[in-house]
Amino acid sequence: MTVTATPRPTGHPGYSQTLPREPESAATARRLVRTAMAAWGLEQDMIEPGTLIISELVSNAVVHSRLASIRVMVSQPTPSLVRLGVVDRSKVLPMLRTDSDGDQIHGRGLVLVDGFSHRWGTDLYRWGKQVWAELEVTS
């Protein structure tokens, strides 16, 4: 698998990788997040929430996407933010579930994303979407 880096206005590269739409891709996505954050010299305490967030975003894409692959993206759009995103070919919007059905084992990942990120959202495209979350850079 190939990791690509693109220049960003902050001087930091962005990292992205196309992965198979399967649960095992979450491990590769976590490694990509760790690699990017280490390359940017970010604090160790950002890695755990970043890897948790990307795992949840990948899991959602695995369940809800239509095609055989997804794209994971990690960038630092400003010196104070890291953006983690997963692009898929589904136009179904993610929903933050706040119900407390104790028997429900799926559907609470976005609650974790919401709790650990500075903010999160969805960018819609003609052919699909990107679900992203941002972490504030700690000094």
Predicted segment positions?
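Heptad-repeat coiled-coil signal-transmission/dimerization helices
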Residues: 26-33, 110
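Conserved short strand/loop->alpha-helix "switch" segment adjacent to the catalytic nucleotide/phosphoryl-transfer site
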Residues: 31-55
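Conserved beta-strand-loop-beta-strand hairpin that lines the nucleotide-binding pocket
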Residues: 1-16, 62-139
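Generic leucine side-chain signal with a strong bias for well-ordered alpha-helical environments
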Residues: 19, 52, 57, 110-112
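STAS-typified acidic loop motif
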Residues: 16-28
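Histidine-centered phosphotransfer motif of kinases
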Residues: 49-67
